[in-house]
């Protein structure tokens, strides 16, 4: 090594371009350079996960996080899934149901490992309606133990979440819904 220079490290084209933007202050202001770094790199550099904006405050929409849920139900075939989907929408237990065909489920049942082709239903509803939705699905579903699980929606497109609430509003006032 002559002249006291550090050894050169060769980097791929994308990496060297990224580093040139990050380390050359004359090219970009500091905030812009930091935006170029992927969140993963920022997490690795800081040692802690990146902070998320508060769901209630990020759009100023007034949406209450968790007031809408996405429920998941598996069915043995598309015919059964469509019948249940139409019924829950007609009864206003859900605003929308997506049918995802040809999923494979592997599970233990009565001491045996089973593998079945099923249809997955993704049901959007108010969280307050999940118990009534569950009761209805259990009453019409052909499985001995129907899968009905729900996850709260923390964030999303406010007009869509508002629409889900509006479509299901009349049922949430009178929760008793029979098959």
Swiss-Prot record:
Any one annotated GO CC term: mitochondrion
UniProt keywords, alphabetically: Glycoprotein, Signal
Region (O-glycosylated at one site): 168-176
Tissue-level expression: Ubiquitous. Widely expressed in brain.
Glycoprotein recorded as keyword: yes
Molecular function GO labels: copper ion binding; enzyme binding
Post-translational events: O-glycosylated.
Entry-linked InterPro entries: Ion_tolerance_CutA, N-reg_PII-like_a/b, N-reg_PII/ATP_PRibTrfase_C
GO BP field: protein localization; response to metal ion
Any one Pfam family match given in the protein's UniProt record, by short name: CutA1
Signal peptide (UniProt feature, chain positions): 1-32
Similarity comment text for this entry: Belongs to the CutA family.
Function: May form part of a complex of membrane proteins attached to acetylcholinesterase (AChE).
Assembly mode: Homotrimer.
Protein name per Swiss-Prot or TrEMBL: Protein CutA
Source organism of the structure: Homo sapiens
Gene: CUTA
């Amino acid at each position: 090594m002559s002249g006291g220079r550090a050894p050169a490290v060769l980097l791929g084209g994308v990496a060297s371009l990224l580093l040139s933007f990050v380390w050359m202050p004359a090219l970009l202001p500091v905030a812009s350079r930091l935006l170029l770094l992927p969140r993963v790199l920022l997490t690795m550099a800081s040692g802690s996960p990146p902070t998320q904006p508060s769901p209630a405050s990020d759009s100023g929409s007034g949406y209450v996080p968790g007031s809408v849920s996405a429920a998941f139900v598996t069915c043995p075939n598309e015919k059964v899934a469509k019948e249940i989907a139409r019924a829950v929408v007609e009864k206003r237990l859900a605003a929308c149901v997506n049918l995802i065909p040809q999923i494979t489920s592997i599970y233990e049942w009565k001491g045996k490992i089973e593998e079945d082709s099923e249809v997955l239903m993704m049901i959007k509803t108010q969280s307050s309606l999940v118990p009534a939705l569950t009761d209805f699905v259990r009453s019409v579903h052909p499985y001995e133990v129907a899968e009905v699980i729900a996850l709260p929606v923390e964030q999303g497109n406010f007009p869509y979440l508002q629409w889900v609430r509006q479509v299901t509003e009349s049922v949430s006032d009178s929760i008793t819904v029979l098959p």
